[in-house]
């Protein structure tokens, strides 16, 4: 997002705004993706759910579940990362822990927060079709189902 502002030698305020927009849009998109990996389905996602878990990726839903979990639950997540033993049955257990602690909802809440920050960063720009398109891009990123 910031490249166009740099090329056109925009004001520092505009460069900073577009930097903030791009950063927060990216975070919002990724957080939504992290949540969808545990709540989506193959038909809507175009990929199997649980891929992040099965690949050993430590995403926010897992981090929050780990932090909130008891010793046994923490050990479960540690073993998944350290021992690299992951399968569909263990995924079901991970989802149960994640759901118990409400980490999907909290991850989505963070996505919405970053989406709001991204939109707020655009406040310095006049209302145009281009700004509107960027605002819709934020909306799509946080309400998407795939």
Where are these regions (language model features)?
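All-alpha prenyltransferase/terpene-synthase fold signal
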Residues: 1-146
């Amino acid at each position: 997002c910031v490249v166009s502002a740099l090329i056109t030698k925009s004001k520092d305020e505009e460069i900073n705004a577009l930097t903030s927009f791009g950063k927060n849009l990216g975070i919002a998109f990724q957080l939504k993706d992290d949540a969808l990996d545990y709540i989506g389905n193959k038909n809507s996602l175009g990929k199997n759910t649980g891929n992040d878990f099965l690949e050993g990726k430590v995403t926010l839903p897992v981090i929050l579940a780990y932090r909130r979990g008891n010793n046994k639950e923490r050990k479960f997540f540690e073993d998944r990362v350290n021992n690299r033993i992951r399968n569909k049955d263990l995924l079901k257990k991970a989802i149960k822990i994640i759901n118990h602690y409400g980490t999907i909802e909290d991850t989505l809440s963070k996505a919405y927060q970053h989406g709001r920050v991204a939109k707020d960063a655009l406040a310095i720009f006049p209302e145009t079709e281009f700004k509107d398109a960027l605002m819709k891009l934020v909306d799509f990123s946080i309400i998407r189902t795939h």
